Swiss-Prot record:
<dbReference type="InterPro" id="IPR009000">
    <property type="entry name" value="Transl_B-barrel_sf"/>
</dbReference>
<dbReference type="InterPro" id="IPR003156">
    <property type="entry name" value="DHHA1_dom"/>
</dbReference>
<dbReference type="InterPro" id="IPR050058">
    <property type="entry name" value="Ala-tRNA_ligase"/>
</dbReference>
<dbReference type="InterPro" id="IPR018163">
    <property type="entry name" value="Thr/Ala-tRNA-synth_IIc_edit"/>
</dbReference>
<keyword id="KW-0963">Cytoplasm</keyword>
<dbReference type="GO" id="GO:0008270">
    <property type="term" value="F:zinc ion binding"/>
</dbReference>
<comment type="function">
    <text>Catalyzes the attachment of alanine to tRNA(Ala) in a two-step reaction: alanine is first activated by ATP to form Ala-AMP and then transferred to the acceptor end of tRNA(Ala). Also edits incorrectly charged Ser-tRNA(Ala) and Gly-tRNA(Ala) via its editing domain.</text>
</comment>
<dbReference type="InterPro" id="IPR002318">
    <property type="entry name" value="Ala-tRNA-lgiase_IIc"/>
</dbReference>
<dbReference type="InterPro" id="IPR045864">
    <property type="entry name" value="aa-tRNA-synth_II/BPL/LPL"/>
</dbReference>
<keyword id="KW-0547">Nucleotide-binding</keyword>
<feature type="binding site">
    <location>
        <position position="665"/>
    </location>
    <ligand>
        <name>Zn(2+)</name>
    </ligand>
</feature>
<dbReference type="GO" id="GO:0005737">
    <property type="term" value="C:cytoplasm"/>
</dbReference>
<keyword id="KW-0479">Metal-binding</keyword>
<keyword id="KW-0030">Aminoacyl-tRNA synthetase</keyword>
<keyword id="KW-0436">Ligase</keyword>
<dbReference type="GO" id="GO:0004813">
    <property type="term" value="F:alanine-tRNA ligase activity"/>
</dbReference>
<dbReference type="Pfam" id="PF01411">
    <property type="entry name" value="tRNA-synt_2c"/>
</dbReference>
């Protein structure tokens, strides 16, 4: 029986023997494709080749790719743990041909690998082929069927519809028929009862697809019509975990050696045993799956956060923590302890896990602890919601309240339902679902984008010349219209461009396209599938005419200064804080720079000052730029160049060197460090567990900041009569102010006591109720203190109502003793109604409530209204 490692190696070895170049997995987190957050298929890293944006370096390629499916149409998250085969992170084994072999070889080699190499029983295999689509003029894929007939009986070759057997990259782009290979893993007696043929593509857990062979031969246009693809592509994908299940004779992916080490470790932590309790088993499967996703995401540079891809990772982590909390009794952080087990099973194949172990553990542990605190907060809020609901004589909490818990505090619905059941209560699920759908619709509306077809003026690829030129003669290769948020923009592709496209944390260039007829403003430059896209608000009237591409040089120079400064900061931080410092992200704009780095505690003011001094010393030294352009990656490593985890580098790279600062980098930089002028750190903060952030200014922005500081200092000196020592003068002022504040507080306490005593002497007893009412100008905090003091002294039958004014703002305050609350009076209900008379609103607890308003003249009437509503 092959282990997971042996299976992965056998696939690569087989296709290497067929002339394929074995390439490493691309990062699971995608940084240069706005249409995707995560790699969700093996073909993602080859999109630019498939789309024709770049030539293929190798015409035959194979790999094992880390994938993540948790958003968009490829969203398996809610299935994970509840069945035997869905995962968030999974490995995709794949082989590709770019204009080389096609259907015959793809089918032949798939069969050879499965049957001859892996020794799978051919009698248990089925193949599907595209049945055709008359409405699109597409015939059945008889070519693929004829090749399958060389290996399979006809009753093992099944026609598949467009949904299952016609693969499309998206609404537009390359597409084509596909042929899926399915395997029947049922026992012999089950196979004898019903043919596997009848269960293919019917969601049977033991009759499953293991390999999809995609034959890309068409291009889908924006009007939905198809045209032939100039260079045909083979794109295959085989689920690694499913393959291991088939080879190891298991009925669940989670029973293979891919997951079992993790599941056993989880069971040991929880003091339970896998296979004894279905709900516990689901929890263990969820955690085993999710720890892989979280660890690899952090490794590839995506930290949990509250935005975009980071939010997805945080949701996955919290889902796992919640399952451990609810079903396995894990009330303390526990997931980070699974990392050694994961490294033991996957560290050889993915050494980046080992290199990033300390950071991964730190981030996961702090995220767990943070969410556990959130869970405790959510439970307290749910307790209050339950109490309020019961007080109103109900046993069902509103779906809106449950959604607020979910959306604001990350408190999952099923945990809410579990706690409610334990308290004999329910939740309005339909209302919750309606709130969820409204939120999703708002998100869809905000993200809706309509993209037209590319209008191709001439064939060709883009050459970036921006390292050497800021102006360059060019012509348009293609363009298209894009509509989003009621705005129409145009995307333009040039044959030569000096415009730097946003990447590596540096914002894209702006500028103009100019010819004798007109000037077109370029408002941004983005990168899609490694293709520079120039964004404009209008098209040239003569798009086929040559144009001069001119970059905004002031913006470019400012970006270059800030980008070079990040390199100097990176080196200085390692020198001051230690070699554990690694860049985790950056943002380079013309106005400022932001640099995120791994470090496990706050950087002290003294350390920041040392970093600043080191950077500015290097700036004063005016160290010249040494650019090593397009050098072999091994040569770059020999130079000592620093690479970023989570970045995918080609065989040839660009290295930027300022003396001892040597980094892989594709951005724009100053010719010498002196051009930066000066660096001033303006803030240091935490952005995630184990990750700190520095923000800084350079050059002219530093001068502006120093001017502002000098002006502020001058104003302060004037305020303190030009005191010779401003620090001493300010401290003296603070001390005097503290003394005066203490005197005021003492006076207010005396006033509170005097008011309270006067009120006690003027208690009105009405029908056995001790009523205290008044209208006075008084701060809200003083009224509250008096109310609670009176409640402490009059423990029964107290009814306190006060109308007060502070800074011309009216306030209504009601305090009721517990026995009156038990009798049916609710302070919150009373102030809510009476507050209308002061043009306001409010509420609170049954025994204490307040309401603010805009009309002080209505206070007396409001106080009387409270008494009237209370029946006093």
């Amino acid at each position: 029986m092959l282990t997971a490692k042996e299976t992965r190696d056998s696939f690569k070895n087989f296709f290497e023997s067929k002339g394929h170049q074995i390439v490493p997995s691309a990062p699971m987190v995608i940084k240069d494709d706005p249409t995707l957050m995560f790699t969700n298929a093996g073909m993602n890293q080859f999109k630019d080749i498939i789309l024709g944006n770049h030539p293929a370096k190798y015409h035959r390629v194979a790999d094992s790719q880390k994938c993540l499916r948790v958003s968009g149409k490829h969203n398996d998250l809610e299935e994970v743990g509840h069945d035997t085969y869905h995962h968030t992170m999974f490995e995709m084994l794949g082989n590709w041909s770019f204009g080389d072999y096609f259907k015959k070889e793809a089918i032949s080699w798939a069969w050879e690998y499965l049957v001859d190499v892996l020794k799978l029983n051919p009698e248990h295999l089925y193949a599907t082929v595209f049945e055709g689509s008359p409405e699109e003029g597409l015939e059945r894929d008889n070519e693929a069927a004829s090749y399958w007939e060389q290996y399979l009986p006809k009753d093992h070759i099944i026609n598949g519809n467009k949904h299952d057997n016609f693969w499309e990259m998206g609404d537009t782009g390359p597409c084509g028929p596909c042929s899926e290979i399915h395997i029947d893993l049922r026992p012999a007696e089950e196979r004898a009862k019903i043919s596997g043929r009848d269960l293919v593509n019917h969601d049977h857990p033991q009759v499953i697809e293991i390999w999809n062979l995609v034959f890309m031969q068409y291009n889908r246009k924006a009007d939905s019509t198809l045209e032939p693809l100039p260079a045909k592509v083979i794109d295959t994908g085989m689920g690694f975990e499913r393959l291991c299940m088939a080879l190891q004779g298991k009925t669940s992916n989670y029973d293979t050696d891919v997951f079992q080490p993790l599941i056993k470790a989880i069971a040991q932590m929880a003091g339970t045993e896998y296979g004894k309790n279905e709900q516990n088993d689901i929890a263990m499967r969820v955690i085993a799956d999710h720890i892989r996703t979280i660890a690899f995401s952090i490794t590839d540079g995506q930290l949990p956060s509250n935005a975009k891809a980071g939010y997805v990772i945080r949701r996955i982590l919290r889902r796992a923590v919640r399952y451990g909390y609810t079903f396995l009794g894990q009330k303390q952080a526990f997931m980070y302890k699974l990392l050694p087990v994961l490294i033991d099973s996957m560290g050889d194949a993915y050494p980046e896990l080992i290199a990033q172990k300390e950071l991964i553990e730190k981030v996961i542990k702090e995220e767990e602890e943070s969410f556990l605190r959130t869970l405790e907060t959510g439970i307290r809020l749910l307790d209050k919601t339950m109490a309020d609901t019961k007080a109103n004589g109900k046993t069902e909490i509103s779906g809106k309240d449950a959604f607020t818990l979910y959306d604001t505090f990350g408190f999952p619905l099923d945990l809410t339902e579990l706690i409610l059941r334990e308290n004999g209560m329910t939740v309005n699920v339909e209302e919750f679902d309606a709130e969820m759908q409204q939120q999703k619709q708002r998100a869809r509306n905000a993200a809706a984008i309509e993209t037209g077809d590319w209008i191709i003026l001439k064939e060709g690829t883009t050459e970036f010349v921006g390292y050497d030129y800021t102006e360059y003669e060019t012509s348009i290769l293609r363009y298209r219209q894009v509509k989003q948020k009621n705005q129409t923009l145009y995307q333009i592709v040039l044959d030569y461009t000096p415009f730097y496209a946003e990447s590596g944390g540096q914002v894209g260039d702006t500028g103009v396209l100019v010819n004798e007829f007109e000037t077109i403003e370029v408002i941004d430059t983005k990168k899609e599938n490694n293709l520079p896209i120039h964004i404009t608000k209008k098209l040239p009237e003569h798009p086929e005419a040559p144009m001069m591409a001119c970059v905004d040089t002031d913006k470019r120079a400012a970006c270059a200064a800030n980008h070079s400064a990040t390199h100097l900061l990176d080196e200085a931080l390692r020198e001051v804080l230690g070699e554990h410092v690694e860049q985790k992200g950056s943002l380079v704009t013309p106005d400022s720079l932001r640099f995120d780095f791994s470090h496990f505690q706050k950087v002290t003011d003294e350390e920041l000052r040392k970093v600043e001094h080191l950077v500015n010393a290097k700036i004063r030294a005016n160290v010249p730029l040494q650019e090593h352009r397009n050098i072999p990656i091994e040569e770059a490593k020999e130079l000592g160049a620093i690479a970023l985890f989570g970045e995918k580098y080609g065989d040839h790279v660009r290295v930027i060197q300022f003396g001892s600062s040597i980094e892989f980098c594709g951005g724009t930089h100053v010719a010498a460090t002196g051009n930066i002028g000066m660096v001033k750190i303006i803030s240091e903060s935490s952005v995630a567990a184990g990750v700190r952030r520095i923000e800084a200014y350079t050059g002219a922005r530093v001068e502006e900041m120093l001017d502002t500081i000098q002006d502020t200092l001058s104003d302060l000196k004037a305020l303190f009569n030009n005191a010779p020592d401003l620090g001493v003068a300010i401290r003296k002022y603070i001390d005097e102010n503290a003394g005066l504040k203490k005197q005021v507080e003492d006076f207010m306490k005396e006033k509170e006591a005097a008011v309270k005593e006067r009120l006690l002497k003027n208690v009105q007893e009405i029908n056995g109720i001790k009523v205290i009412k008044f209208c006075l100008p008084m701060p809200a905090e003083v009224v509250k203190n008096i109310a609670f003091q009176l409640r402490g002294e009059i423990t029964e039958n107290l009814f306190f109502v006060a109308g007060t004014v502070d800074a011309n703002k009216p306030m209504l305050t009601v305090m009721i003793s517990d026995n009156l609350v038990a009798g049916g009076l609710k302070a919150g209900n009373l102030v809510k109604e009476a507050a209308k008379l002061i043009q306001g609103g409010g509420g609170g607890q049954p025994h204490f409530a307040t309401a603010g308003g805009k009309n002080p003249d209505g206070l007396n009437a409001a106080v009387e209204k409270v008494l009237e509503l209370a029946g006093i």
